[in-house]
Amino acid sequence: MAVIDDFEKLDIRTGTIVKAEEFPEARVPAIKLVIDFGTEIGIKQSSAQITKRYKPEGLINKQVIAVVNFPPRRIAGFKSEVLVLGGIPGQGDVVLLQPDQPVPNGTKIG
């Protein structure tokens, strides 16, 4: 069972997608995201398996919520630096978590 101390280890922040493109090299369909997390964290990239509901062009300027303190992972040669969070209503289906009102990039989630 997880305890509050486990949750407090996560650095969860808001960011704005500034670039998105298809990622055909990925084993599972995905989109490469470039996300602005503000001056403290900066620009980070992520591979997100969100192709069932989203197209790259529709993601630009969308705010998302991500864990920013996991170690980077290499996915088909691409360095994924953050884990973008979403709800999973079904197999292969992800709905991005977003603030319901705009907040500054880098805002902590707790």
Swiss-Prot record:
Q: What is the lineage of its organism?
A: Bacteria, Bacillati, Bacillota, Bacilli, Bacillales
This protein's name: Probable chaperone CsaA
Q: Name one Pfam family in it.
A: tRNA_bind
User: Where's it mainly located?
Assistant: cytoplasm
Q: Where is the tRNA-binding domain?
A: 6-110
* Superkingdom of origin: Bacteria
Query: What GO cellular component entries does it have?
Result: cytoplasm
What does the protein in this record do? Can suppress growth and secretion defects in E.coli secA and secB mutants. Probably a molecular chaperone for exported proteins or may act by stabilizing the SecA protein.
Self-association and partners: Homodimer. Probably binds SecA and prePhoB. Probably interacts with proSdpC.
Q: What induces it?
A: Present in exponentially growing cells (at protein level).
| The encoding gene | csaA
Q: Which UniProt keywords apply?
A: Chaperone, Cytoplasm, Protein transport, RNA-binding, Translocation, Transport, tRNA-binding
In which compartments does the protein localize?
Answer: Cytoplasm
What's a single GO MF annotation on this record?
A: tRNA binding
